[in-house]
């Protein structure tokens, strides 16, 4: 039996960065808000303190902060002719399942996406002609501009304690920063993290090649900091336990220690953990949503939570899944090229080289999530001529360390036996002496990369699993080959003792090894309901009181990590709801 609860002004599904931002902003505006999070509450003092957090087996190998694939997963295939099979263990990407979401266990890399992404089709057609874009590449403009988002990027960076060096303030190029970035109103809230040896060596080599290295902006506080909301950060300890871990020092920007505690102190807010939302409910004419149904996973009780506004703020994949399960918006059909929900799923590509320097001591166990140096000469540099190389998109190149832990980090030169005495000797010899140079590359939307509901497999609640159909296309192969050439050229100029050269990802994509937790698309934003699921305010074209906030609204994927625009869009959407929608409920953009 389902228990119907008292109606609230807004219900939030998923409480990570986006849900936390909306919870804080809407409760402060006077709305009664309930947040439903299927994960557990974790706090720094109880769950991420030393020695608890220094457990690679628990947090990295056994995915303690991640979704449990025995209860819910996806089915995976490379193309529509294949049978999709369930992902039985996490690999390629790692969605969080905890209060605070994936922001609890991320590295902190925080970028500003620019009009090169938001106006991607217009800009490429203008520069290279319409025929340059492949017929099956379904990229489109997003319907928003960098100028509109700039104040919200700024707000997120100051909330999340981003450390970095501005490259462009008000149109004036700044020494030491990224000269290709779009103009920002002011400097980062904190100076960059301390450069490590690998980053210093890469910086010198990149400059010799005529490139423009700069410290990677990251939500790892380089010194103690109090953000504008009063949330207090400690300084990064360079402990090496960053990606896949909570932060012992409260130095990593995370919703669980910033916006969420602020919301929880507000009497207008209620958090319910272990609450798995199974469906968004619609009224009789299907033009409004009326709330959600959810199950308490600890005891199996089922509830209906009525609400005036429904906000989908779960991980990107789960937001799309819930839209499909709830029958909101037309499901995408790749053959007919109709429908919008499930359309334009994108991932990222890349290439990397490992360099070995006999006699060097890199101390890779001492690092931060953002202790990298990056070049954007082949990324947001519009002077880089893609036409010569025949691909749409871009990549950034970086060097440094993130998490070099004893179980997972064992760099050895190619040709080393994979086990036994020689392997042991090689891991001991090369652990201290190796560094990495890697590229993160964009993936453009393609007609045949999409989500839909699996016809065979179901989750613990008897609902169809999400089916992901994805593979890299020739565009990504070309991009990856170019990235590998640039990486190898820089690497060879550094004269390593041994070099595992970079190669492009040209084999079919596989879900098995970890690559990145940067899944985008599925309920994309746009200018009209024919091509997109939500408008520029992330409001559903079909049900005006439904908003979905996350990387699922991205119309393609860039080379950058998505959290910067995700956070900015959350503040942007909160602003639109507070100042426009609540005063006059209805579509914020005419269809």
Annotate each predicted stretch with a short phrase.
Residues 10-12, 33, 546:
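Conserved hydrophobic helix-helix packing surfaces used for dimerization/oligomerization
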Residues 25-28, 32-34, 39-56, 266, ...:
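Glycine-rich loop(s) and the adjacent beta-strand/alpha-helix scaffold that form part
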Residues 44-47, 163-184, 497-509, 583-591:
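Short, glycine/acidic-rich hinge or "gate" loops at secondary-structure transitions
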Residues 59-61, 67-74, 84-92, 97, ...:
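Conserved redox-cofactor binding core of oxidoreductases
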Residues 78-83, 87-106, 110-121, 125-126, ...:
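FAD cofactor-binding and catalytic pocket of flavoenzymes
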Residues 215-222, 238-239, 278-281, 432-443, ...:
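A glycine-rich dinucleotide-binding beta-alpha-beta segment and adjacent secondary-structure elements
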């Amino acid at each position: 039996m389902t228990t119907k609860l008292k109606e609230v002004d807004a219900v939030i599904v998923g409480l990570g960065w986006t849900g936390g931002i909306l919870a804080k902003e809407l409760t402060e505006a006077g709305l009664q808000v309930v947040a439903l999070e299927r994960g557990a509450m974790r706090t720094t003092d109880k769950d991420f303190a030393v020695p608890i957090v220094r457990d690679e087996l628990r947090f990295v190998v056994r995915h303690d902060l991640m979704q449990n694939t025995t209860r819910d997963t996806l089915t995976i295939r490379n193309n529509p002719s294949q049978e999709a099979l369930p992902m039985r263990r996490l690999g390629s990407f790692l969605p969080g399942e905890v209060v605070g979401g994936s922001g609890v266990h991320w590295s902190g890399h925080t970028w500003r996406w620019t009009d090169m992404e938001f106006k991607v089709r217009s800009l490429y057609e203008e520069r290279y002609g319409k025929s340059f874009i492949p017929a099956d590449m379904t990229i489109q403009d997003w319907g928003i501009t960098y100028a509109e988002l700039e104040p919200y990027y700024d707000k997120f960076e100051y909330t999340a304690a981003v450390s970095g060096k501005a490259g462009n303030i008000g149109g004036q190029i700044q020494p030491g920063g990224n000269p290709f970035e779009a103009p920002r109103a002011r400097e980062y809230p904190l100076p960059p993290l301390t450069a490590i040896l690998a980053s210093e060596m890469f910086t010198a080599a990149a400059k010799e090649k005529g490139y423009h290295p700069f410290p990677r902006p990251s939500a790892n506080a380089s010194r103690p900091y109090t953000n504008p909301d009063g949330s207090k950060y400690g300084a990064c300890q360079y402990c090496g336990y960053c990606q896949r871990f909570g932060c012992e020092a409260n130095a990593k920007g995370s919703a669980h220690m910033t916006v969420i505690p602020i919301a929880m102190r507000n009497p207008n807010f209620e958090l319910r953990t272990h609450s798995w939302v199974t469906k968004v409910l619609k009224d009789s004419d299907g033009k409004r949503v009326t709330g959600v149904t959810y199950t308490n996973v600890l005891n199996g009780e089922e509830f209906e939570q009525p609400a005036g506004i429904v906000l989908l703020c779960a991980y990107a994949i789960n937001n799309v899944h819930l839209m499909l399960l709830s029958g909101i918006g037309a499901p995408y059909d790749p053959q007919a090229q109709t429908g919008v929900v499930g359309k334009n799923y994108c991932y990222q590509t890349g290439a990397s080289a490992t360099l070995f320097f006999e006699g060097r001591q890199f101390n890779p166990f001492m690092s931060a999530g953002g202790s990298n140096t990056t070049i954007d000469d082949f990324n947001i540099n519009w002077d880089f001529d893609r036409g010569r190389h025949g691909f749409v998109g871009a990549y950034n190149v970086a060097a440094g360390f993130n998490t070099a832990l004893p179980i997972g980090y064992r760099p050895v030169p190619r040709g080393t036996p994979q086990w036994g005495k020689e392997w042991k000797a090689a891991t001991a010899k090369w652990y201290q002496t190796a560094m990495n140079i890697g590229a993160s590359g964009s993936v453009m939307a393609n007609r045949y990369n999409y989500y839909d509901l699996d016809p065979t497999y179901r989750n613990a609640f008897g609902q169809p699993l999400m089916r992901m159909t994805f593979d890299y296309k020739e565009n990504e192969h070309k991009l990856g080959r170019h990235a590998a050439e640039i990486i190898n050229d820089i690497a060879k100029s550094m004269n390593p003792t041994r070099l595992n050269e970079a190669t492009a990802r040209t084999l079919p994509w596989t879900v098995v090894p970890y690559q990145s937790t940067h899944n985008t698309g599925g309920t994309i934003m746009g200018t009209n309901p024919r091509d997109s699921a939500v408008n520029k305010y992330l409001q559903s074209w079909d049900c005006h009181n439904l908003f979905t906030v996350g990387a699922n609204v991205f119309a393609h994927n860039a080379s950058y990590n998505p959290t910067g625009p995700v956070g900015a869009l959350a503040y942007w959407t909160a602003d639109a709801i507070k100042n426009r929608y609540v005063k006059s409920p209805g579509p914020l953009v005419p269809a």
